[in-house]
Amino acid sequence: MVSELELKEIIGKVLKEMAVEGKTEGQAVTETKKTSESHIEDGIIDDITKEDLREIVELKNATNKEEFLKYKRKTPARLGISRAGSRYTTHTMLRLRADHAAAQDAVLSSVNEDFLKANNLFIVKSRCEDKDQYITRPDLGRRLDEESVKTLKEKCVQNPTVQVFVADGLSSTAIEANIEDCLPALLNGLKSYGISVGTPFFAKLARVGLADDVSEVLGAEVTCVLIGERPGLATAESMSAYITYKGYVGIPEAKRTVVSNIHVKGTPAAEAGAHIAHIIKKVLDAKASGQDLKL
């Protein structure tokens, strides 16, 4: 049986050995820290949203990568993404979150007023007071407020053959990305057809149906609104043109002709402008739009 004195001696030896080992390990760690140097580079982190998903296959063991890419190039859908266990890989998750954030920004942000001035567009607005009301009350987004009605009557040509205007809709980003190329191409195209055009302007917090109110206020034969579309994970920059012949408040949606997917990976803005002008010419010739127009 170990006596109390022997037990104290054993414990003392163990503590001394632990102290020596701890000191040695601490020195080793310290030496390691001294020899390792952190390397920090100045610069800008690459924007992950600039990668073209149609050119990326994340599957590590793809049997025929080139053949799979042929399918991917035909769609913006997220095909061929990889997983870590049951979860997305870090790259895939970051891209999803980045695209979702871009979509949120497109809806909740506003078009820069300096941008509108640079494109000679004065501002009117719907009856919505803010973005929250715009999202929850679509009916108010379809009507002009009283001040805007007065502004249009003062600044715009009355009874134009075609009234073209721009609206933020659900994507302010789409307007800033496409209008500089699309609007001039559209106006020049109409001019080349000898069609008179009213005074372009910008409508804030507007829905597609606001074009009907504009048509009644200005007496336009054809109304065309270039509006930002609801963004998604594929793109936050998609714009559409809604064309209506002799629109009025309450007109059925089926009476509108639509040119959609106007963005850099869809129909290019300048090309879309020329195409819209051609469609408007057909609308005027047929005196009809929407399902009544045979293209």
From Swiss-Prot:
Location of this chain's protein in the cell: Bacterial microcompartment
Pfam families, per the entry: EutC
GO molecular-function terms, A-Z: cobalamin binding; ethanolamine ammonia-lyase activity
UniProt xrefs under InterPro entries: EutC (IPR009246), EutC_C (IPR042251), EutC_N (IPR042255)
The protein's annotated pathway: Amine and polyamine degradation; ethanolamine degradation
Task of the protein: Catalyzes the deamination of various vicinal amino-alcohols to oxo compounds. Allows this organism to utilize ethanolamine as the sole source of nitrogen and carbon in the presence of external vitamin B12.
Name recorded for this polypeptide: Ethanolamine ammonia-lyase small subunit
